[in-house]
């Protein structure tokens, strides 16, 4: 499961406004507040120096950071320093200083200096969530409500809601604010209602509650209130960006991609009514009048794309739709929160793709990922399967700490309910064991290739599941009997592979280098996002290790192509930044020797087939749901053209990716094809 701690984009760094030698303590709770996962301790010394001790661990990984800084009279950093380790072990060492009208900074990813006039706040790359306190307090002192940022950008915020919390009989007032100017979407936080406000709680609904110690019991109520406030913001986005298609809609002169055959046809007319395709005819021949007309102008019309490995958050919807993703499979989430998102999407109130849920089941351990159900025995595992079946989930996803002894019984039980079973490989097993025990699908290329690297003592609940493939895949002989026998096993069992190649780009990214996963879109995103994409999360000790990790990643791509050519089904998933990552994933399939048309087939037909919605969508034909995308260029010849989405139709609504992109601070990739 992906981490929500993306330092430098959603959050800033450090804190302020506590009395001398006073420590404010925060506790980090996950999975709806049910489990403790870390802490944040903030102390202001008598000399004006503030220190922050931050540690967070979930899913066997997480950052450990120590910050120290001093503030100027305007509440912004004069000096700042953070050290520690990132989510997967990369060193963090970043410093900043202001001397009059000049500032300079240096981190493991970048360095710079620039002149500055007046108030401006430095935004660290490696900071903690606590920096919201500095930003909010500094913003509160700004008459214009805007705070210039270093190296670039401007921060602003507005109040969304008020609440009362209590501790030991004493009550206090807090408020929810939405902070904009960093990243693609607002960051929401609960802050104190003081002359100098500070962070009270940072809540990521369904996953994290970072809340002041002693107020843990208020976390659930604050999370519920935050969901209501965010629902209003998201509903306003949907109302602004969705274009209703009442009555009939005619798409003229579109070249239809046949996702079942992976071929591109001649220009056609497509007539839509009540979210369904009611007829397809030769281009220019449809004579019936329609309430809405879309002139495709010979562009390619594809079924909406499927992202088969997402962990949906409500602000992800715009990025998905702008990239042509109209359906996602959620591979692990807080169950209550995900059910709410699904209901909002189905009601038309949420800017989002369709969500097909996979039920997350983890085993209880110190390294467990806290989401879905965390079980200890067979009875609890069966209860989880029952709950997911009763709520319409077509499959379950098993995770790292799942008890290996009960795996055959649980897969058999899920199959008896008509459900598919997929997941990571439980610790102390190999992929071939999981397949023989009933897995229908395996998530992630590292989980596949660990089959040849682990022994009965390898703890894949830790970051070893990343470092071992990075070190060893480079030396694997894919033509060896062991590897060929494993490929034959996957073919024989018709095992589906969800490789998520793009998300593993991090194993070969050195600090300071732009992530190759996003280099093709970097010029389109805000500068702070570009800067963050230069941050490496992997500890790469020297040039020799970098060369090994690079070769290992290239061989992961190669192995994906070998599996496909052997007849092993693939689905296209991401487990990373919504939208952009799926487009890069398809490029990597082509790099693996898969044709562009076949890559598009994987992202459409295969997605619908293995999400079990092929009877509803995934193919452009009469009777199917009108989930469609118009693309400039020809992605069946040049897969990079898949980024040029000019129009998205999702049932009874149309979306212009250019409008969504502009709302998110992204430079559009194509001119819109508008509905007349």
Give residue ranges: language-model regions.
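Solvent-exposed helix/loop surface patches that form functional interfaces
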Residues: 35, 89-175, 227-228
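Extracellular/periplasmic ectodomains of large secreted or surface enzymes and adhesion receptors
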Residues: 212-253, 286, 294, 388, ...
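Divalent metal-dependent hydrolysis catalytic cores, especially in the metallo-beta-lactamase
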Residues: 317-337, 352-360, 389-402, 411, ...
